[in-house]
């Protein structure tokens, strides 16, 4: 008999309070002695977390997808912070690899089964599979957070991991293509692989998104492409193609001698650099240190008031230190600073704080969009979050807030326009957020980040641009059994190099919307928007 047998009814298997009570007593018994705890559990949220899209009967029916979106962001941040503290001497590459292994699909499925969630999944007309179990785990975390808050969700996840995961085995485990590509980039000192996601409606199933991932090298060249039903899998496939193109995978097998090959390439590149480049001092006269007043004023600029807590300047110095400005042994005489005002080399780079700050930003934006767009689906929320948290947006925010001017970078990086480098400057903002989170707490970070986005980014316009009205029209036609939407060219104007297209959207023979733009696709979007808004308004 299953240990969860007493907590579900074999007729409908609906998740229930006795099961939640069992989970609390098993993982966070301290919750019941907390006098400030919430006095009731909203079981409707947990029930929603178990509803697969196949159970939809009416348009108003809910599924677990929004809670899955929220749970993904929560789990990601808590695991990131946990590893950051537990492995406080390890570098960002190690932490990233370990986190990837915990967040893998098979790992999530295992955790879902450890909790017995497979007993409560509501599906119709299909068989329970690992993909659903992976989703259900994240949606359960989302529901848990909405009921019990961050404090107890963090405690629950940490105890769950410590009970069911052998971290030593995960550290030794290394067959992950994304891991290997990250190691390759680190060996080449290329920073991080840049993944670009595109989300489209899967033509085989209009209810699900299809992810297309492209991975780029530091020279902005696409080196791998992957397509799958989940973002993680598409990134794995893109990484596999990249490793093949880079010569790490040969005839489908990983070349065991690849690290030696990288080191050889690296040595040759270093020797060429020494021959070709004029030596330059690492010390950068343009660098400047953050002060407590600068940090306070920066926060006040974005309507964020500091609580009565001492600012840990060492932590913020670390957050602003690019790896090019670290202490190194045996500096040549030319590298001795000529002025006492020049900022000294630092002991730690900001890479660990970037690792943490990235996850904090991911969570804050995810939760904000979840609440702001309460009627929007997981696909839309994911696309919008990607726009707000991508490196270009973070770079823009760092420049607008002037955080970029406090990055400590070597003179060589400065000359190479390092303060205009999207990854370096965007990473600086991530690290600043990580330091702010550790020093002051989530509430202040949330207030700062949401205010800087509100003031510097037009979120409503970004959201409007992200709305794919052609997808909405397709769903509308499918729901009403109207067949397929038909777009026709009504008019073409102007010379070939500067054409203006007028497109019409038809339902049968009836013209439902007209759009005019410099491309057919844009005109179709405008026509779709007009029809959709007319349908909603009427």
Swiss-Prot record:
CDD domains: DSRM_RNAse_III_family (cd10845), RIBOc (cd00593). GO terms for molecular function: double-stranded RNA binding; ribonuclease III activity. Keywords: Endonuclease, Hydrolase, Nuclease, Repeat, RNA-binding. InterPro entries: dsRBD_dom, RNase_III, RNase_III_dom, RNase_III_sf. SMART domains: DSRM, RIBOc. One of its GO terms (biological process) is rRNA processing. Gene3D superfamilies: 3.30.160.20, Ribonuclease III domain. Residues 408-477 form the DRBM domain. Residues 24-149, 238-381 form the RNase III domain. It catalyses: Endonucleolytic cleavage to 5'-phosphomonoester. Its EC number is 3.1.26.3. It comes from the Viruses. HAMAP family: RNase_III. Belongs to the ribonuclease III family. Digests double-stranded RNA. This is Probable ribonuclease 3. It comes from Acanthamoeba polyphaga mimivirus.
